[in-house]
Design a protein with these regions (language model features):
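Ligand-binding beta-strand-loop-alpha-helix segment within the catalytic cores
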Residues: 9
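Alpha-helix N-cap/helix-initiation sites
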Residues: 12-13, 93
Length: 157
């Protein structure tokens, strides 16, 4: 966006601003506040698509735990169903756990269904140490997924 190259693809200022908003918010911790429902919907769509793509790209590199485990703070956040500060990742297992925590930031049930159908979540779970505390987080996550998959997305009415 800084170079303005994307303007070569849009003549309509409103569409350009919509795409700019969605792309600029695709990897932020939270979507920038807006009263524009269309902007918000597109930002959510791009964020979900980005997560699905990252799960796909990283799947071939997923391997068993390297024995370093997950940082206790990350496990606590996972058990609570919350997000974490990515800058505090210390281990390979932290990286895996972050990808599980992303599920709580997937906006559309359709997106989550794609993630579930590709087995991304279970593959990550199977490559983490599953102690008692981790199992609490996994149970919470699976329950959340089941609930989320029952919701209707905005285009479903």
């Amino acid at each position: 966006f800084e170079e303005g190259l994307i303007k070569n693809f849009w003549n309509n200022k409103e569409d350009y601003e919509l795409i700019e908003f969605a792309i600029k918010n695709h990897n932020k911790i939270k979507i920038e506040e807006t009263n524009n429902e269309r902007y918000l919907a597109f930002a959510k769509l791009i964020r979900d698509a980005d997560k699905i793509d990252i799960y796909r790209v990283l799947k071939p590199f997923l391997g068993p735990t390297d024995g370093t485990g997950c940082s206790p703070d990350f496990v606590d956040l996972f058990v609570a169903g919350k997000q974490c500060d990515y800058t505090k990742m210390r281990t390979q297992d932290d990286r895996k756990l972050v990808r599980l925590m992303w599920v709580y930031d997937v906006y559309f049930a359709w997106s989550l269904q794609q993630i579930v159908e590709q087995n991304y979540i279970e593959d990550i779970i199977n490559n983490l140490v599953q102690d008692e505390k981790m199992m609490q987080g996994i149970t919470r996550l699976r329950n959340y997924i089941q609930e989320k998959l029952q919701t209707k997305d905005i285009w479903q009415g």
